[in-house]
């Protein structure tokens, strides 16, 4: 194999993934002598293609599993997808609607065929995207939440929970989505502030003597009112408790009752009670044995209980009802009112509180079990730790979970009703006399099945299955903090309840991927980025490295094309350094030829030490999920130290005549680059495999090579300190050259003065580095040098770098040039100061623009101070 002159990600990545999969590198070894490491992929919905959030999620998971595989663990990274009930059904219904067909037109069976066809199409897209990202998944174990194995687990859990009293069927107020025509759980409702109205109406007393004032934001629900309540301690209403009022329009008599729930400070202090359309009213209705009158149907239209408004949309009814009340002089006032209104997370429809018979999970005992577990040694480790408080708080305030959905796509509830007696049968299989029973048509909330994901995918409820025994509990869950309640919490309490173990050791939570300006990515804003477009432009390795290292745990990530491009430049730097190294190592040099036992130069010892320090740092940081810090450590070592310094230093022996020294340099280049590729591999799998295959190595793929370990034999602390001092000296020389505008191509005298005999000896022994990088016409290293009158000086530790300026530059011209430059920076400072002191600008300009101006000021001030210091030094 030969490395091309230029890095081309398309060429590097082509065919590589298929080879990895076909050769089975991602399959767990099953070696019983090895410790296991398992991650189950958070199953993406089959509603569409993957977005950047998925790419971030899976990149972190792949880094962890690739690293653990290299560290000798029996590693399983299990793929799978979620049927995503309401979301997928909505997509397929929309597709049918475009053809003028509804699901009811074609029936349940035919509709489900359409959904399965959709699922197959989008599952194929998702697998293609996983491949493009380079994810080390074991496809032999791929799962889908509607697979028979997972469906069996769902049925068993439902039946067991029902038998334990943890699942019950009851009539309660639930969140109803009139567009999807299904119940929703509390966390599927998004509350948004809406500019609405607060309507104040007269409810006349039945005896004809006056009225009581009632305020509401939802006038259409008054058609279902069955009482008025006031606080028993409210002096204004003590005399009317027990009286009756007439419900306008309907003319139904309503009793006035006392209930402590009423807030005397809110509105008029009197409250209408609509038990079928408000959760608080429902509780009041239960206490006072009130009738519950449902006035809407499942589409949000008024039903026959709404009288003349029957058939109207709820909001149309609201407008008409208010007009009718105005005609009867029953409207006191209408106020503007901003209030939080629940919307369906999936359809965006305004959610209707609705009295309905549904299936519920009794959450109190399950939440208690999860909270108690966090006080034991078996507790789940949240990263960052602050999210444990978020989890605990939600569990402490949890309400029962509505799990039935009025959909067709999903796990049909394993409950049957006797056709004659109405008796309920709940079982994993249908009743023996199935012809006498009818199965509940509803399906389970998607999150019910995905809550079982960590163990149902590994063979549960067959607790003797090999995968369940070996790979459960899993080691880490990596997901966004936005689904702690939807998914993470449910996996925890389901796992504890049914396996007796925590489903994972650690939960690593990342934030959201945002646009460059910090706004959330969305279709409506048109600021979304397709990860496949990024991969086609810059390669998977560039995207992966950016996603992995661009943020710290728990924080959002701002997508930046510029930053992805800078990673691409980093990979180019690695590519070029590797090409140079491989060309100089030569085809004849083999892995077994590496010999680091003798003749190591100072630079060799330094880079070997820094390699081992970086291996330790990267290993420790990865174990703590500090991927951003890993990125900095790798960049610093690879770009700043290996590429910029060691590669250049290696040219000294490689261009020399000493063959033994050349062989040592080949050994060091091979050793360092090969281990660096292994260390970088989990982050950049494609380019590291390409380079590794061209290096002397052992084994057939970097995927299954060993993670590099720290080798104490190649840790040379004194040599490292010495080399770092040499580098600082060279940097000081370069800085001084820059300040007097003297290019490296021009040889100049360089003096280094130090009183430290050991430093002098070390510099004497390593003059070749100073000569190569400083380009001196004369190099003097001494304990006793008299500094010339005209010279640039720079203190470096226990030494001083001196550049005599006599004859080197025209001092007067240089000072004049610098004074012009300082005038330029002063005028820039004046301009930006004027802008920032302008109150009109500061008050009206966007924060981003103001911050940009402040950054400019800081930059100009630094440049001004630097030039000023150079002028003063030259004048001195």
Swiss-Prot record:
Keyword hit for Nucleotide-binding: yes
UniProt short sequence motif 'HIGH' region, positions renumbered to this chain: 44-54
Enzyme class: ligase
Renumbered ranges of motif 'KMSKS' region: 520-524
Molecular-function GO term, any one: ATP binding
Keywords: Aminoacyl-tRNA synthetase, ATP-binding, Coiled coil, Cytoplasm, Ligase, Nucleotide-binding, Protein biosynthesis
InterPro entries linked: aa-tRNA-synth_I_CS, aa-tRNA-synth_Ia, Anticodon_Ia_Val, M/V/L/I-tRNA-synth_anticd-bd, Rossmann-like_a/b/a_fold, tRNA-bd_arm, tRNAsynth_Ia_anticodon-bd, Val-tRNA_synth_C_sf
Binding site for ATP: 523
Coiled-coil regions listed: 805-876
CC annotations in GO: cytosol
E.C. numbers: 6.1.1.9
Chief localisation class: cytoplasm
Pfam families: Anticodon_1 (PF08264), tRNA-synt_1 (PF00133), Val_tRNA-synt_C (PF10458)
Family: Belongs to the class-I aminoacyl-tRNA synthetase family. ValS type 1 subfamily.
HAMAP family, per database record: Val_tRNA_synth_type1
Domain comment in the entry: ValRS has two distinct active sites: one for aminoacylation and one for editing. The misactivated threonine is translocated from the active site to the editing site. The C-terminal coiled-coil domain is crucial for aminoacylation activity.
Subunit details: Monomer.
The protein's name: Valine--tRNA ligase
């Amino acid at each position: 194999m030969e490395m091309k002159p230029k890095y081309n990600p398309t060429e590097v990545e082509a065919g590589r993934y298929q080879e990895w999969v076909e050769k089975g590198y991602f399959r767990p070894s099953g070696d019983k002598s090895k410790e296991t490491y398992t991650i189950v992929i958070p199953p993406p919905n089959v509603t569409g293609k993957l977005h950047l959030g998925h790419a971030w999620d899976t990149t972190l998971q792949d880094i962890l599993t690739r690293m653990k595989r290299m560290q000798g663990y029996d590693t399983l990274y299990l793929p799978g997808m979620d049927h995503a009930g309401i979301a997928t059904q909505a997509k397929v219904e929309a597709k049918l609607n475009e053809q003028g067909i509804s699901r009811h037109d074609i029936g349940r069976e035919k509709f489900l065929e359409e959904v399965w066809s959709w699922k197959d199409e989008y599952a194929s897209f998702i697998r293609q995207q996983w491949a493009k990202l380079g994810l080390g998944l074991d496809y032999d174990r791929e799962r889908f939440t509607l697979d028979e194995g997972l469906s069996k687990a769902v049925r068993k859990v439902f039946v067991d929970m029902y038998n334990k009293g943890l699942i019950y069927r009851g009539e309660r107020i639930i969140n109803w989505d009139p567009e999807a025509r299904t119940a929703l759980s509390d966390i599927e409702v998004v509350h948004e502030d809406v500019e609405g109205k607060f309507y104040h109406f007269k409810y006349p007393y039945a005896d004809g003597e006056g009225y009581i004032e009632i305020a509401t934001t939802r006038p259409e629900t008054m058609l279902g009112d069955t009482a008025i309540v006031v606080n028993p301690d409210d002096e204004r209403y003590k005399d009317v408790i027990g009286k009756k009022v007439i419900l306008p329009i309907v003319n139904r008599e309503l009793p006035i009752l006392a209930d402590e729930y009423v807030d005397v400070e809110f509105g008029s202090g009197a409250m209408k009670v609509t038990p079928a359309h408000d959760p608080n009213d429902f509780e009041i209705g239960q206490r006072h044995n009130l009738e519950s009158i449902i006035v809407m149907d499942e589409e949000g239209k008024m039903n026959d209980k709404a009288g003349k408004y029957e058939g109207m949309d709820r909001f149309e009814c609201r407008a008409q009802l208010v007009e009718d009340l105005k005609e009867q002089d029953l409207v006191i006032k209408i106020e503007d009112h901003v209030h939080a209104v629940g919307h369906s997370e999936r359809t965006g429809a305004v959610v209707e509180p609705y009295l309905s018979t549904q299936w519920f999970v009794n959450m109190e005992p399950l939440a208690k079990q999860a909270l108690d577990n966090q006080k034991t040694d078996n507790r789940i480790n949240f990263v960052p730790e602050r999210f444990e408080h978020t989890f605990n708080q939600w569990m402490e305030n949890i309400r029962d979970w509505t799990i039935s959905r009025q959909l067709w796509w999903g796990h049909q509830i394993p409950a049957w009703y006797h056709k004659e007696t109405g008796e309920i049968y709940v079982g994993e299989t249908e009743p023996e006399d199935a012809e006498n029973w009818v199965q509940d048509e509803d399906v389970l909330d998607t999150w019910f099945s995905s809550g079982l994901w960590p163990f149902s995918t590994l063979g549960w409820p067959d607790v003797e299955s090999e995968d369940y025994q070996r790979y459960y509990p899993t080691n880490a869950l990596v997901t966004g903090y936005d689904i702690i309640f939807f998914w993470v919490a449910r996996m925890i309490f389901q796992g504890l309840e049914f396996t007796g173990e925590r489903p994972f050791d650690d939960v690593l939570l990342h934030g959201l991927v945002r646009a460059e300006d910090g706004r959330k990515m969305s279709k409506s804003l048109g600021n979304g980025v397709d990860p496949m477009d990024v991969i086609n432009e810059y390669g998977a390795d560039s995207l992966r490295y950016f996603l992995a290292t661009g943020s710290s745990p728990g924080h959002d990530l701002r997508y930046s094309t510029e930053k992805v491009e800078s990673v691409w430049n980093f990979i180019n730097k690695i590519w070029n350094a590797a090409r140079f190294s491989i060309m100089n190592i030569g085809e004849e040099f083999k892995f077994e030829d590496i010999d680091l036992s003798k003749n190591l130069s100072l630079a060799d010892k330094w880079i070997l030490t820094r390699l081992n320090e970086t291996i330790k740092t990267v290993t420790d940081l990865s174990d703590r999920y500090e991927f951003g810090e890993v990125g900095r450590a790798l960049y610093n070592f690879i770009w700043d130290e290996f590429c910029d310094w060691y590669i250049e230093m290696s040219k000294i022996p490689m261009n020399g005549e000493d063959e033994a020294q050349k062989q040592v340099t080949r050994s060091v280049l091979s050793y360092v680059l090969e281990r660096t590729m292994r260390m970088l591999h989990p982050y950049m799998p494609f380019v590291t495999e390409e380079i590794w295959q061209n290096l002397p190595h052992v084994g057939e793929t970097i995927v299954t090579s060993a993670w590099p370990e720290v080798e104490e034999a190649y840790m040379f602390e004194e040599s490292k300190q010495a080399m770092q001092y040499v580098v600082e000296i060279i940097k000081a020389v370069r800085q001084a050259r820059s300040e007097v505008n003297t290019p490296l191509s021009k040889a100049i005298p360089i003096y280094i003065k130090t009183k430290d005999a050991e430093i002098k000896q070390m510099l004497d022994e390593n003059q070749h580095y100073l000569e190569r990088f400083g380009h001196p016409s004369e190099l003097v290293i001494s304990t006793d040098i008299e500094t010339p009158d005209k010279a640039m000086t720079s203190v470096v530790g226990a030494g001083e770098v001196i550049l005599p300026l006599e004859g080197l530059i025209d001092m007067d011209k240089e000072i004049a040039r610098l004074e012009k430059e300082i005038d330029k920076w002063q005028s820039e400072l004046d301009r930006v100061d004027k802008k920032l002191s302008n109150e009109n600008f500061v008050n009206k300009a966007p924060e981003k623009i103001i911050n940009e101006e402040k950054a400019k000021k800081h930059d100009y001030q630094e440049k001004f101070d630097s030039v000023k210091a150079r002028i003063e030094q030259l004048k001195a």
